[in-house]
UniProtKB/Swiss-Prot annotation:
NCBIfam families, sorted: aroE (TIGR00507), PRK00258.3-3 (NF001319)
An example Gene Ontology molecular-function term: NADP binding
Residues that hold NADP(+) according to the record: G128, A129, G130, G131, A132, N151, R152, T153, E154, E155, R156, I222, G245
Purpose: Involved in the biosynthesis of the chorismate, which leads to the biosynthesis of aromatic amino acids. Catalyzes the reversible NADPH linked reduction of 3-dehydroshikimate (DHSA) to yield shikimate (SA).
Subunit structure: Homodimer.
EC class name: oxidoreductase
Family membership: Belongs to the shikimate dehydrogenase family.
HAMAP family: Shikimate_DH_AroE
Record InterPro entries: Aminoacid_DH-like_N_sf, NAD(P)-bd_dom_sf, SDH_C, Shikimate_DH, Shikimate_DH-bd_N, Shikimate_DH_fam, Shikm_DH/Glu-tRNA_Rdtase
Swiss-Prot/TrEMBL GO biological process terms: amino acid biosynthetic process; aromatic amino acid family biosynthetic process; chorismate biosynthetic process; shikimate metabolic process
Protein name in UniProt: Shikimate dehydrogenase (NADP(+))
Amino acid sequence: MKQVFGVFGDPVGHSLSPAMHNAAFSALGMDCIYHAFRVTPEKLEKAILGAEAMGFGGINLTVPLKEKALKLDFVKPDPLAKRIGAVNTLVFGKKGDIQGYNTDGPGAKQALLDTGVEIRGSRMVVAGAGGAARAVAFQLAADGADITVINRTEERAVGLAREISAADLPGKIRGTGLSGLKELLRDADVLINTTTLGMHPNTDATIVTAEELHSGLTVFDIVYNPLETRLLREARTSGAKTISGVLMLVYQGAEAFRLWTGVEPPLELMKKTVLEALQA
């Protein structure tokens, strides 16, 4: 009997996780299948307990369920997920325990390392102050980066930075509004966009243009649809190094795969599968 895995969210029909994980299971000869399940916040508790009762191998969670899942009494988050305040991966233990993890931060970290970014001491500008920004900023602060969180609503950026500072991590962090972005980027090593600006169908939107970027910068956009966002095009024009959101998607998925199975996933195949799905 096949072991079932899946992603819960609403909406969830657009998810590339089923294609990515099913390709990995097939390549490794594992008798497993991964589905997308539409689950609304009010049904989340029943859905998780139902999945555990039916013997699911594990679950991914996406918008709008990550924060709500952390608050469920029976979900036991690891320290990083607890700090971030959200879980995106659930692992069902043999004794009925349900462990919660957040693989978004590790996924972003691996994407940066793969591109040759030295995280410790790097001056990083993180655009956005939502759930993705929290996951990325907590991870990078834990790894010793010097971070400035920028957001249209300055209070949110300042609040997030204050919260991360209170965790007493090796990195430095501050928050600000958008007004000083040009000056910040002049001295920055990395710009990470964690907002939805530029995501399909609003593909002409961008947080900055080529004039505000420079060739010494690495620009990382976590948006992966379209494959090359306007921000990444602007970065390429300026001579900056670019990182596609596909890498973070694949690496966070690969980390979930390891947590569920204890098996090393076929990363190149997962990446190829996602790229083919986006180009279809």
